[in-house]
Amino acid sequence: MILEGFKKINEEQITRVENTLNISFPLDYKDFILSINGMCAEGELGIAIPLNQEVIAIDILYGIDTETENCNILEWTQEYKEDLPENTLIIGDDVLMGFFILVCKGEDKGVYYYDHAYNLEGSDDDGNTYFIANSFEEFINQLTVIE
């Protein structure tokens, strides 16, 4: 699968975001940001991931300094900082504006879907965050093209 990303960035830009958020990006995520710096889904939502028998259509995987409104990791993570666990980034969203989050370290490390708007059946105040993958690389490998 070939992903079309935003403009290229450098290590200094990543370090600036890491320092601002006081987070160290996992190496696989840093490599993704350096290579394509996020992406917008093309066509009919482009890609999706299976989540408990539901398919979540990815809208955007955020980048750094993208020059595209509402596509920046820093902007979204700072806006929802109070709702997020420590060492967590908001890395993207789906078409219903649920968020894909990356817990960067600790026992809960991995990628999750955060259904803050309770769009999924079964989401409520007691459970609206769903585990997807142990690492960002595993998450990317689960992406499929929507026909």
Predicted regions and their residues:
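A surface-exposed partner-binding patch
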Residues: 1-98, 144-147
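Short, surface-exposed beta-strand/loop micro-motifs that present aromatic residues
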Residues: 98-104
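Intrinsically disordered, low-complexity regulatory segments enriched in Ser/Thr/Pro
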Residues: 108-121
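Pocket-edge structural micro-motifs
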Residues: 92-93, 104, 115-116
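Aromatic side chains
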Residues: 25, 29-32, 112-114, 136-139
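Compact, glycine/acidic-enriched structural inserts
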Residues: 118-142
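Short glycine/proline-enriched coil/turn segments at helix->beta-strand junctions
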Residues: 96, 107-108
